[in-house]
A protein has these predicted regions:
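Hinge/lid segment of periplasmic solute-binding proteins
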Residues: 3-63, 117, 207-213
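Short helix-initiation/N-cap motifs at beta->coil->alpha
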Residues: 79-84, 167-182
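Short, solvent-exposed loop/beta-turn-alpha elements that line the ligand-binding surface or hinge
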Residues: 22-33, 74-80, 109, 127-152, ...
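Extracytoplasmic/periplasmic solute-binding protein
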Residues: 40-48, 53, 83-139, 185
Length: 351
């Protein structure tokens, strides 16, 4: 009776089976409609876990950089836009021997265990800003308005990393996690879920922070971290009334009872979008970093990659990013995969 979809694209396949949750207790407990999937006034899905990603950073190493006599940026408060990030990354790279690191950024691995960080999560930024500028929340034809911004952050990763750009095809997600957790790199693009991969190593808990991914857009000083969900509860409307009610009761128990909340927050380590979880935050410094940005009034970047037209679109974009990095392709190919590929894949998926 209870099933899960990953967002608007997944919902399109299953929406005819979705029970309207608009009058449910669990919907009343949601912080905002940012965390629900709607079809008109009907609530088809409710996120039960929200996650956050950005640039995980090593506070101790960054402070070591700030203390360099010729460091242009002297505090984390100044590191609030792309130009500042570029300056810091390039100066860390120039002083990597002094700082005892292999590079400013961990390797941008493009094997299948890591490429999603760039073809999906990094690509979310230009999509987010285009949607925001155009006042939309999905499209059948992306324009690529912010592709120059995508290029400059990708270039920054490639040119200020623990490895040469030509080596990224064989670099893995484990490589990047290891480089960060051993103190070989200052910045690591990933999310709150990566905590378990990097804890209990060289980087102390109190030295783990997270920065927004700045790509050089006006006003990004007020940008927060990328926060959203790919995990939405849906209820099968074709089930018996008895089963539907039992499922609604179970969902209410999960988000309102002490036992249910303890299970989600502490045993599973989830951050949830429910008002009932104020006292149930997992013991994860990356989660706390996001809470600090929210409290400071920063605007979170929504997860718009859930509107990407297909896996094929992501894979073609990833291939173009890799070819560009290795010098076997041009940025024009990235643009083609991003813009033309979107229209083609959207049309194919919605025939």
């Amino acid at each position: 009776t209870l099933f899960q979809v990953n967002g608007p694209v997944g919902l399109a396949t299953w929406k005819d089976y979705c029970y309207d949750l608009s009058k449910s207790d669990v919907y009343k407990d949601v912080e905002s409609d940012d965390y629900v999937l709607k079809d008109g006034d009907a609530v088809d899905g409710i996120a039960y876990v929200i996650e956050t990603y950005g640039l995980i950073y090593n506070k101790a190493l960054l402070n070591k950089y700030f203390e360099l006599p010729d460091a242009s940026i002297k505090s984390i408060d100044e590191l609030n836009n792309f130009q500042a990030l570029k300056t810091v990354a390039e100066e860390i790279q120039a002083h990597k021997d002094d700082l005892g690191v292999e590079g400013a950024f961990t390797s941008a691995g493009m094997d299948s265990s890591s490429d999603w960080r760039f073809k999906t999560h990094l690509a979310n930024l230009p999509i987010y800003y285009e949607y925001k500028a155009d006042g939309i929340d999905s499209t059948d034809a992306i324009k690529g308005t912010y592709l120059d911004n995508y290029k400059q952050i990708w270039d920054l990763y490639l040119n200020n990393s623990t490895c040469e750009p030509s080596m990224i095809s064989s670099k893995t997600g484990d490589d990047a996690a290891s480089e960060f957790s051993l103190g070989e790199a200052v910045f690591y693009q990933n999310g709150t879920w990566a905590y378990n991969d990097i804890k209990d190593n060289e980087v102390a808990e109190e030295d783990m922070g997270m920065l927004p991914i700045y790509i050089g857009v006006d006003g990004e000083e007020n940008q927060g971290l990328c926060t959203g969900s790919e995990n939405y509860w849906c209820v099968n409307k074709n089930a018996s009334e008895e089963d539907i009610q039992a499922t609604l009761d179970f969902m209410k128990w999960v988000v309102e009872s002490d036992e249910g909340r303890d299970m989600l927050a502490n045993q599973m380590g989830f951050v949830t979008p429910f008002t009932t979880f104020a006292d149930y935050l997992p013991d994860n410094p990356l989660v706390k970093a996001n809470a600090e940005y929210t409290e400071a009034g920063k605007t979170p970047v929504s997860w718009n990659f859930t509107t990407m037209p297909s896996e094929n679109w992501k894979n073609n974009l990833g291939g173009a990013l890799l070819n560009y990095a290795q010098g076997t392709g041009t940025w024009d190919s990235v643009q083609t995969a991003f813009v033309d590929g979107w229209a083609e894949e959207y049309a194919a998926a919605n025939e």
